Amino acid sequence: EKAGYLSEEECARYTAEPLKLNFHVNDHKDGVAVYFRDYLRRYMMAKRPERSDYPSWNMVRFHQDSINWENDPLYGWCNKNRKKNGETYNLYSDGLRVYTTIDSRMQEYAEQAVYKHVVKYLQPAFNREIKGKKSAPYSGNLTMEQVNKILMRSVRQCERYRVLKESGATEEQIRKSFNTKTEMSVFTYHGEVDTIMTPLDSIRYYKSFLRCGFMSMCPQNGAVKAYVGGLNFTHFAYDMCMEGRRQVGSTIKPFLYSLAMENGFSPCDLAPNVQQTYMVAGKPWTPRNSSHSRYGEMVTLKWGLQQSNNWISAYLMSKLNPQAFVTL
């Protein structure tokens, strides 16, 4: 006992007691920066791009991937490099250590901020907007025929449809399956809940959730410090940060003003803050503006950018070469 050994009595007693385990399975869908880790996985495990693997409408992606394959050592690293036995590397089983620029503290703050902003403010506002509308969660400008067309496209893209199709089910049988109520667990912002609804209604339900993306980058060296591709990787694996496509909107304006500065304009130069009509591709185009503040005045370009004024942006665009803006 003095040497730290158990007596026979103690050994028998402890052996008879049940083991208390605190076992946790490590899942790639859990933890910090899930979307970033998945993006990095796909990037490092990418294979040499083959044109035949890309649909005709996505040739831009093929060209970009081809450039990455030739110029970026990290792109496809696992397939470009070989182990001593000649095999390619496995990101999961070969003991690789991958160092990134992600700041764990900033990442945690970013995930919390995105979640709070969407759940507390944006989603409730969107829910109020679509409440009671037949076309919900889509715009009221769409006809029901257009809404149903969008939903059916989503139906054909889901796993249930593929499984039924591969099993030989007819379109009528598939349609009946999607309109039959079934037990399922669905996502909520407060955890999964069990419910009963048709698979078609579940698609519409998931379409009502707002998607979001967030990325924080160091302006000095381009290092990514925080990366949020969505709110829940398990239910919304599509990465809105890198894969999501959207109109740039007013975020394009600083680039327009940068081009203007390169072409001799100054932040102090004056421009007419009035609505004007321009000829675009032989047709008249009249930009609108959300505010009429200082309408009719001569305002500085600095003020125009601060106010995100569409009329000043259109005025600048008329004075510059559109192609130069595209290639900026």
Where are these regions (language model features)?
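Extended, non-catalytic substrate-recognition/exosite surfaces adjacent to catalytic cores, especially
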Residues: E1-K283, R288-S290, K302-W303, Y315
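Metal-dependent DNA phosphodiester-chemistry modules and their immediately adjacent helices/loops
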Residues: S293-N321
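Mid-domain, small-residue-enriched loop/turn segments at the edges of structured enzyme/sensor domains
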Residues: P284-N289, N321-L328
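Short glycine-/small-residue-rich flexible loop motifs, especially phosphate/cofactor-binding loops
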Residues: Y257, A314, Q323-T327
